[in-house]
Amino acid sequence: MARDQKDHYYRKAKEEGYRARSAYKLKQINDKFHIIRRGSRVVDLGAAPGGWLQVARELSGGIVVGVDLERIEPLEGIVTIQGDITKEETLEQIAAALGGQADVVISDAAPNLSGIWDVDHARSIDLSRAALRIAKRLLRPGGSFLVKVFQGDMFNDYLEEVKREFSSVHAYTPPASRKESAEIYVIGKKLLSAPVRSGEIYDVTVDSVGRTGDGIAMIQGFAVIVKNASPGERLRIKIGPVKQRFAFASILERL
């Protein structure tokens, strides 16, 4: 507590009526990446005590839903749900409160700390993976995701998992994070609705040629652009960057 009382953001939160100093982390992240906009429908996973909920409501002015195992003291204009985010019934409650799909899913949740770094890092990754799974269920195509992760040897693998699901992904530590903290925030923008993901391998037939002269193969109605390919060719391809409306691929083998 003594450290908190000397902390600039702790004092600022008290003065400005935020429930936690972490409110400024969300403000700073949103200033840089613009994930919450006016009218955004926002879900906050692990929302207690509610600092992020307060900021999300200010930024959005729309529907904001907070979920936590602990009871969240009521906040005006915000729906709070006490429940386990891994349970189907909780997800149904969230969907009902939203009245549709979310535009943004955020999570500043942290695991119960053991003091053993490898254990705490692994627990953080597990929690972040759970948040990603839930975000994929709740978000509309093109929606955004923000989650806190502890840095460590599994972080890069997790970052790659997020990159497979979103068109644009960033890792960022806001100024309000304590200098001694190992936390970092992962931001995913534009949730992909494509039936393919980067790194996947497919056998395809090139259907046509695009304006740039590259071959185009269709996978479940989704266009995949293949360089140096001609119509009628049968190819084994590896998916590269995936966009909202198309993907790129490289040729592994001509069949």
Curated annotation (Swiss-Prot):
Specifically methylates the uridine in position 2552 of 23S rRNA at the 2'-O position of the ribose in the fully assembled 50S ribosomal subunit. It is an enzyme of class 2 (transferase). It catalyses: uridine(2552) in 23S rRNA + S-adenosyl-L-methionine = 2'-O-methyluridine(2552) in 23S rRNA + S-adenosyl-L-homocysteine + H(+). Residues 195-253 form the TRAM domain. It is found in: Cytoplasm. The keyword Transferase applies. S-adenosyl-L-methionine binds at G50, W52, D68, D84, D108. It comes from Methanothrix thermoacetophila (strain DSM 6194 / JCM 14653 / NBRC 101360 / PT) (Methanosaeta thermophila). This is Ribosomal RNA large subunit methyltransferase E. It comes from the Archaea.
